[in-house]
Amino acid sequence: MSNDAVLDRLGTGLRVLELDPITYRPHPIHNHDRIWTETNCYVDLWIEVLHSLGADPTPALAFVLSAGCDGRQWDFVKIMPEDLRTLYGIDVAEMNVWRPVLEHVVEGLDDGIHVTVEVDGFWLPDTAGTSYRNQHTKTTIVPNLVNREDKVMGYFHNRGYFDLTGADFDGIFNLAPEPHAEVLLPYVEQIRVDSAVLDAGFGDRDLDVARAHLARRAPGNPVDALARRIVADIPLVQTAGPDAFHLWSFGLLRQFGATAELAANYVEYLDGRGAPGAAAAAPHFRDAASGAKAVQFRMARAARGRDVVLDEPLIEMSKNWAAAMDLVAGAVGT
């Protein structure tokens, strides 16, 4: 599609990147043939933002090496601000929201600066079939285009780039028919990019980042703590019902499974970046991700009140994670 056609459809507005939702192609990490199609709104969002800035997001997945379980949940993994700064010259900092959010977004776009914004998924059409016009949920987006006159916004969310219009525009920015006073101010971050650092590349800093995450991982195998929590929660899941199950599974199985699958991508990257042998960990990470999916299916039966036995898949998840981490540590060093 030509730039003129994009402008005709989306309007002129303010934008940082020339993107069109119709022709946008997500990063290969977000192909549909994955075991876990999504991680969480923040990780998936940053993969696409980095991809659209012309950078490879894979080095920023180093957080998988320090991810763990505190006995209550698997880490809500995030691409770390310090890694964004080290690898890409990108500084991410919380904004003081003292004006209507739309004003901050527009001012940022006018200055060539993106922001992350917490919004209500109820107004995001890309979530059709889940939260869109059905359920109020917190999620994070990065607006890239705003046309205030025509009420159009182009935005990054989860695994892609989308647009919304009309009543959804009003809803996202709490505009119509008038602002609701009880709506809390969202968490907003400014994304400042040092183009010189981004364009120059990161040299061997990606390996330094990998070693730093390995060095600060908790002792022991975090999957053992995860397994204990899952087993302890079986009675809760059996009585709480399907809706509660989805929330429970997100914080334990989806976060772990997606972390393991991203780790497979990451170690394959490391293997070609001066850590030969790291790719040998990828099959173990993918088996761990598949194991988490199998446990999720069994726990879905528990959510319908059935008895489940999880010993075998949980043991295999733990073994695969341990084997993978040993291989990575040996290849990368600390």
Give the role of each language-model region.
Residues 49, 94, 105, 117-119, ...:
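Generic structural hydrophobic/aromatic packing signal, biased to beta-strands
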Residues 110-125, 168-181, 205-210, 328-333:
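A short, terminal or domain-edge coil/loop segment
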Residues 66, 73-74, 104-109, 178-183, ...:
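Short, highly charged low-complexity linear segments
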Residues 33-39, 44-69, 98-150, 155:
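Active-site-adjacent substructure of cysteine-protease-like catalytic cores
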Residues 204-334:
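Charged low-complexity "KEKE/polyampholyte" interaction tracts
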Residues 148-252:
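Noncatalytic regulatory segments and standalone regulatory/sensor domains
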Residues 6-99:
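A structured, charge-rich N-terminal accessory region that forms the first stable segment of a protein
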Residues 1-2:
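Type-3 copper protein
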